[in-house]
Regions:
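Glycine- and aspartate-rich repeat motifs characteristic of hemolysin/RTX-like Ca2+-binding segments
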Residues: 6, 10, 29
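A structural signal for short, hydrophobic beta-strand segments that form beta-sheets
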Residues: 3-7, 34-36
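Short alpha-helix capping/helix-loop boundary micro-motifs
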Residues: 17-22
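Intrinsically disordered, low-complexity Ser/Thr-rich linker and spacer segments
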Residues: 1-4, 59-63
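SH3/SH3-like beta-barrel superfamily modules
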Residues: 25-58
Length: 63
């Protein structure tokens, strides 16, 4: 897939693929972003505000 759709209600975007990484911003369900990569643990890398951010695979899907 080329885009990542946010499926959770309100999801943190982080600088890395885990909850221990710093939060960049919050995104909402229904928003879509360019998909860069998916980590082994299921987190998806997206482009947001010109930078790379990561969202949990529990709350996002590649479409």
């Amino acid at each position: 897939g080329v885009t990542v759709a946010i499926t959770g209600g309100s999801v943190y975007v982080r600088v890395g693929n885990g909850t221990n990484y710093r939060i960049i911003t919050t995104v909402k369900a229904g928003m879509t972003f360019d998909h860069i990569a998916t980590a082994r643990n299921g987190w998806n890398a997206i482009v947001i505000n010109g930078q790379v951010g990561w969202v949990s695979g529990k709350y996002s899907k590649v479409v």
